[in-house]
Amino acid sequence: MELRTVVATVESGEQDAVLKVLQIYNQEKSQCFTFDDEEREERKKMAQLLIKFLERELQPSCQVTCLESIRILSRDKYCLEPFTTEEGLKTLSRHAGIDYSEELIREVPDLEVILESLKCLCNIVFSSPRAQELTAEARLVVGLTKRIKLYNERSLPHEVKFFDLRLLFLLTALRVDIRQQLAQELRGISLMTDTLELTLGVKWMDPYEVATEEGLLPPLPRQETERAMEILKVLFNITFDSSKREVDEEDAALYRHLGALLRHCLMISADGEDRTEEFHSHTVNLLGNLPLKCLDVLLTPKVRPGSLEYMGVNMDAVNILLDFLERRLDRGHKLKESLTPVLNLLTESARVHRQTRKFLKAKVLPPLRDVKNRPEVGNSLRNKLVRLMTHIDTDVKHCAAEFLFVLCKESVSRFVKYTGYGNAAGLLAARGLMAGGREEGEYSEDEDTDTEEYKEAKPNINPVTGRVEEKLPNPMEGMTEEQKEYEAMKLVNMFDKLSREQVIQPMGITPSGNLAPMENAIRDMADERSSSDSDLGLD
């Protein structure tokens, strides 16, 4: 059907005729996501007419059809202007049942009308900064949270709940002020935690342990999984700075309650491997936002038959995180987005919980036996992580190195032993530890256990490559002293030329363990030696 015909019919305002042409238009354009530039002005006019038409007293079926047309038009970012006015957004939010009002009694729209209105709002808010600003001013988040609070009392269809949560996610992702309003004024962390608990349908065995039947937990149904993931995304947005600030006991209890639910999310699967991976990914992202002291709930559950026990502690959740990490490593896709959250989570957990660190150390860095291959060669988890230490992405290589460094109790010698000095140099240089030593950290004094194979090979291991190198013939064998001196000077001159032309910059290690240009390093060492001589009265 010609667009101008649709526009003319809508302009006439006759309800039955409008309903008929819009039904045809919606059917023809239901899968249309790209639009011709030639008809842009016609679409804008149609959008204006539809918003005005929707303000009239219409039958629910006509409202739904009109909203379906608005949803189709809202896919075109060049036609959003009629929808991004105060009046337009108020009309849509009223039909969605979420317009902010101080009145206690409000008319409840038809459920299909609510659903289509929510879909329209999601499209418009996602694409229009002006709409985002107006929804913040209109306090739509208040109306949304009021309805979410009633999920336990009202029987709403899955799709309405899903798009409620999707709209809330978009608002909190795109507007810092709405994020803060939900977290603080509307007590959003508590509300969304309760909503997650309701969605998962859990029962509690202890304050921070979800009750489970013996054996494998059944997969979370598809609809509940979809809603749970939207809730996790909203919670991620409003807890973004939680790990960086101190929390009082009341907040700590709330975060521990949430952490226990997230542990349960890790322990269950969704409908299919891909959906489970996505569900666990959102769970890991949110766990990384929790205050560090609240991560102890990952280890809280008692050891039961079938649990993975280490040092008397239930390590099921930590082991699942480690398996999740290895799957992400093997997939090798978008490493920064997929790896850094779980690496950071495991690193911080290992830093603050001794049992977690020792368990991860046993899994990732078992006592060395293979000393013939470089640390980055092979298929073990250690090999895969060491390979990341020279990754092109700075964040990825830093996270991998930091994780292994913490497992080594931030001991330089132990770190070099497992990774090789060449791989370790980046982190050591950044930390000012090139001269060796150890970072400040609270770690137990247990010793690293060396295998017989490692002890036997240790004198022959090249610290740079981290393996026993084959003995190569001496290139200077058979040379006279004059020839050796000539080759040495030739090498010095080559380095000097490269340095003067600024192709390379010779670096040295300062007494503090930092890298510095060679002349600076030599000067610092001379100053320190002079200071030492003065202290000894050798002037």
From Swiss-Prot:
Keywords, in A-Z order: Chaperone, Cytoplasm, Guanine-nucleotide releasing factor
Main location: cytoplasm
Region (Disordered): 507-539
GO molecular function, one term: protein folding chaperone
PANTHER family to which the protein is assigned, alphabetical: SYNEMBRYN (PTHR12425), SYNEMBRYN-A (PTHR12425:SF4)
Functional description taken from the UniProt entry: Chaperone that specifically binds and folds nascent G alpha proteins prior to G protein heterotrimer formation, promoting their stability and activity: folds GNAI1, GNAO1, GNA13 and GNAQ. Does not fold G(s) G-alpha proteins GNAS nor GNAL. Also acts as a guanine nucleotide exchange factor (GEF) for G alpha proteins by stimulating exchange of bound GDP for free GTP.
Protein name, as recorded: Chaperone Ric-8A
Species assigned in the record: Gallus gallus
Lineage, opening ranks: Eukaryota, Metazoa, Chordata, Craniata, Vertebrata
Gene: RIC8A
